[in-house]
């Protein structure tokens, strides 16, 4: 993988040394009145114009969706859970449905619940067995309806169909971490494959036809996995980042690489990641480090970074 002339220099052992860069475009959120610590954010394009909607959720599960379009400034709508749960704030996450942008799912850790909303209208609540840690709507040929939600809860991966009433909507449940450690991340490929990872530093890729493990990549990082994303340029590659400052892009299927998970490329930031994410339809990624540095990169079809 070739590192082209961008806003960073290569240092020792894959460390990227940041340099000053000019911000081409930025949005300012005029109003985002959360009353508790923000736990998660999500971004989705607007279906009616070229703008974006930013969703943020606080530790109590109350979320705000804000329009980033200059023509429609300010907060769009806000909603919160119908029940107060245990009255304690903890992890919370929000994810939008790419097929139906108005549909959002909000996970609440202490409450062991996932609330589904259509804009600011509460649709239903899914009750998990353990504390949820990550959630996403599944995409791909097998999930054209856009109503299938995947949730990591403890060491388990649970699959939910929003159209089903039996068993509370849960259609499948499987063990994603054989050691019993918590799962922290989940990703879905364009082919419908589902990957999970967490504290045991293993990336497990599931076959959605039988919900059985298709591949296991052990010891992928030095510390526990906190984020996953399949490559849009090459579906055989997966991005993995962890609790420290490391990012690895490597093949997930060892059968096609002779039993090796040799990285296509990897790099380290200047300090621990506070946030890191990748676009769903391209290999454009960005991370924010504890030192206040923002890293951004793009891998094109020629395998140039």
Predicted feature residues:
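Short coil/turn segments that connect the beta-strands within blades of beta-propeller domains
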Residues: 50-52, 99-102, 144-147, 191-192, ...
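Blade-loop segments of beta-propeller domains
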Residues: 5-51, 88
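Canonical WD40 repeat/beta-propeller blade segments in eukaryotic WD-repeat proteins
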Residues: 33-46, 83-97, 128-142, 172-188, ...
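Blade-level signature of beta-propeller repeat domains, shared across WD40, Kelch, NHL, RCC1
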Residues: 275-305
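Structural core positions within WD40/WD-like beta-propeller blades
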Residues: 55, 104-105, 148-150, 195, ...
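Per-blade loop-tip surfaces of WD-repeat and WD-like beta-propellers in eukaryotic adaptors/scaffolds
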Residues: 3-9, 14-23, 60-81, 106-134, ...
């Amino acid at each position: 993988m070739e590192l082209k002339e961008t806003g960073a220099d290569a240092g020792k052992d894959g460390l990227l040394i940041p340099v000053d860069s000019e911000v081409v475009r930025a949005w300012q959120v005029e109003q985002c009145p959360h009353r508790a610590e923000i736990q998660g954010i999500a971004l989705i394009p607007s279906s009616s114009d070229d703008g974006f909607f930013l969703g943020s959720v606080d530790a109590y599960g109350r979320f705000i969706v804000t329009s980033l379009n200059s023509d429609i400034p300010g907060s769009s709508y806000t909603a919160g859970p119908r029940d107060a749960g245990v009255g304690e704030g903890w992890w919370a996450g929000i994810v939008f449905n790419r097929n139906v942008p108005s549909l959002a799912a909000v996970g609440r850790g202490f409450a062991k619940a996932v609330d589904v909303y259509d804009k600011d209208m509460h649709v239903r609540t899914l009750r998990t067995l353990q504390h949820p840690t990550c959630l996403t709507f599944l995409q791909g040929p097998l999930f054209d309806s856009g109503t299938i939600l995947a949730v990591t809860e403890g060491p388990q991966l649970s699959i939910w169909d929003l159209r089903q009433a039996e068993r509370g909507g849960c259609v499948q449940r499987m063990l994603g971490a054989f050691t019993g450690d918590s799962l922290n991340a989940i990703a879905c490929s364009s082919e419908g494959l589902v990957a999970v990872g967490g504290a045991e530093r293993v990336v497990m890729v599931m076959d959605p036809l039988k919900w059985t493990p298709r591949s296991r990549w052990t010891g992928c990082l030095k510390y526990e996995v906190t984020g996953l994303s399949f490559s849009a340029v090459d579906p055989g590659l997966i991005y993995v980042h962890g609790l420290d400052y490391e990012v690895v892009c490597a093949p997930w299927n060892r059968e096609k690489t002779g039993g090796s998970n040799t990285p296509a490329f990897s790099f380290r930031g200047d300090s621990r990641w506070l946030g890191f994410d990748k676009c769903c339809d391209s290999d454009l990624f960005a991370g924010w480090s504890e030192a206040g540095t923002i890293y951004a990169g793009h891998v094109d079809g020629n395998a140039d970074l």
